[in-house]
Amino acid sequence: QDWSSFQNKHIDYPETSASNPNAYCDLMMQRRNLNPTKCKTRNTFVHASPSEIQQVCGSGGTHYEDNLYDSNESFDLTDCKNVGGTAPSSCKYNGTPGTKRIRIACENNQPVHFELVLS
């Protein structure tokens, strides 16, 4: 995966409005076409600008191991976990908003993979 697909999968800034976190996840997973053949088990959307997230690969992050970096700052985010439904258009999600640090993989100073939300 590359930086542009990372942005499609994981960045929503400013945050898209929805009636509640579950509806937000259902909407965003469909809008970004993230369930083409099966419902993705879990996906996290970060509500920060691409440049802020890109900084985690440099001065805004701490090297963890290999090409993984942990953000120094916490980001507003929504964690989406699949709770059923069918792909591509009716996958159902349980959304949990939060403000947490993230771990991402970087290549050439650009985020290419979302590893996890740090607790």
Curated annotation (Swiss-Prot):
Name of the protein this chain belongs to: Ribonuclease pancreatic
Binding site for substrate: K40, T41, R42, N43, T44
Keywords: Disulfide bond, Endonuclease, Hydrolase, Lyase, Nuclease, Pyrrolidone carboxylic acid, Secreted
Subcellular location: Secreted
Pfam families xrefs: RnaseA
One GO molecular-function entry: lyase activity
Reaction catalysis annotation: an [RNA] containing cytidine + H2O = an [RNA]-3'-cytidine-3'-phosphate + a 5'-hydroxy-ribonucleotide-3'-[RNA]; an [RNA] containing uridine + H2O = an [RNA]-3'-uridine-3'-phosphate + a 5'-hydroxy-ribonucleotide-3'-[RNA]
GO cellular component, one term: extracellular region
Top enzyme category: lyase
Catalytic site positions: H10, H113
Family as reported in the entry's similarity comment: Belongs to the pancreatic ribonuclease family.
Signal peptide: none
